[in-house]
Amino acid sequence: PITFTPYLGIRSSRQMAPEEYAKKIINNEIVAVIEGQAEFGPRALGNRSLLCLPTDANIKKLNIIKDRDKDSWRPYAPICQKEEADKWFHITKACPYMLHIAKIKSGPFNTYDNSARLQIIDRNSNTFLWSVLDMLRQSGHSILINTSLNSKGKPIVNTVDDFKEIQIHDGLCY
């Protein structure tokens, strides 16, 4: 059978173990992920992403890093494990690739219209990201905020060398 995958881009070797990413995220750091094959399409799915906990302080930091207006109509996208999704969102369709909108039930973040372009991860769809989320869940955090790893007006980063060339890497871990 033919299997769909959005991971068609350049492959990158692991920069840090999932445990290291999880520790940094739990410490309220924003991490840059360059992991596995790059995503194809108009969104970042965790392999070329900036990830953080959904706190007001982190959202403010992301707005500065991404050079966004604080009242941007484009909210950041949440990622959670399949096992946690029903707790936080009204799910009507599978959301492995951020192609559907889910209404927010409750949670540590809000959007202007109570909707989110959600990505739901299961153990088989993205083992790396599922592992990071699993470690976060054990620390009481079950949602990550995700945005593409690029600077304003630029394409998504493909390689570590690309990342080093853009201006958003100051103070970020990868």
Q: Model-found features: residue ranges?
A:
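Flexible beta->alpha loop and helix N-cap segments adjacent to enzyme active/binding sites
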Residues: 1-174
